[in-house]
Design a protein with these regions (language model features):
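Histidine (H) residue identity feature
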Residues: 3, 35, 173, 213-215, ...
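Structured extramembrane domains adjacent to transmembrane segments
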Residues: 72-216
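Intrinsic structural disorder
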Residues: 1-3, 13, 17, 51-63, ...
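Alpha-helical transmembrane spans
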Residues: 1-46, 235-238, 247-249
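Intrinsically disordered, low-complexity regions enriched in serine/threonine
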Residues: 203-249
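N-terminal topogenic membrane-targeting module
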Residues: 33-98
Length: 249
């Protein structure tokens, strides 16, 4: 292993024309500065961290791109049906679009989030949720956006940002429930109310625990506290280079 690292170090030195530890140090500082400035800009921007959702009545419930239509057909083939199409404004007339699918027993919800990309493409992220008889909320997702905040104690969240396969994500979600010997029960509220309640709960909890500033102070100090910004910065590194988020269980 040592000789492999030495060979890589020599190759990197030849490529950059500098001593590799110095290169890595400068690169680390540049990456840190970039991410820290981006986090600070998000903190003081008008973009909501926990946007409120509304029913999507625009008719644009699912993008008509072949690769995205295949996902919809796969969901239907698994016995999942769409129960609601939602949207949330994140600023400047830009909307997050969400389509919620549910199984016949109403014990599993699959939230498909459409993320607009800078190049005009549309990214997909999935959030799978089940509620147990003990009141626990099992969440398995592949969101690539850092959260780094706090979840309620009865939320058991596993993030797998490098898993782009919905089939494998669903398999993992079911395996988690099976391993915990947890029995999923039917949802008692419709997706819109459940999602907005969850957003409000996350805002409240993260304000209480010091991840976010209290609402009256956000105009002067931004939304995210210094401790919160550090947590976000750390999670960005973990997502980008380790493919995993902080442990939330």
């Amino acid at each position: 292993m040592r000789h492999i690292f030495a060979s890589f170090s020599n190759w990197l030195t030849d490529l950059t024309g500098c001593w590799s530890p110095s290169f890595f140090f400068i690169w680390f500082l540049a990456e840190t500065l970039y991410h820290w400035l981006a986090i600070s800009a998000l903190s003081v921007s008008p973009l909501p961290l926990f946007p409120r959702y509304a029913i999507n009545t625009s008719g644009e419930e699912w993008p008509v791109q072949p690769r995205l239509l295949k996902v919809r057909e796969w969901l239907r083939a698994q016995g999942l049906r769409q129960v609601q199409a939602l949207k949330a404004e994140v600023g400047g007339g830009l909307y997050l679009r969400v389509s919620i699918y549910q199984d016949a027993a109403s014990t599993l919800r699959v939230q498909v989030t459409f993320l607009p990309q800078n190049n005009g493409a549309i990214g997909l992220c999935y959030t799978l949720t089940s509620i147990t008889g003990a009141g626990e909320r099992y969440i398995t997702d592949n969101l690539t956006v850092p959260f780094a905040g706090f979840y309620p104690e009865n939320w058991l969240v596993e993030r797998r940002p490098w898993s782009r396969s919905l089939a494998r994500l669903l398999e993992r979600h079911r395996a988690r429930l099976l391993a915990a010997k947890a029995t999923a029960v039917s949802f008692s509220t419709e997706p819109l109310n459940d999602l907005n309640f969850a957003q409000n709960e996350l805002d409240r909890l993260n304000t209480e625990l010091g991840f976010l500033h209290p609402h009256p102070e956000r105009e002067d100090f931004g939304k995210i506290t210094h401790e919160g910004r550090y947590r976000v910065w750390k999670e960005i590194w973990m997502l980008n280079y380790l493919g995993r988020a902080q442990r939330y269980e």
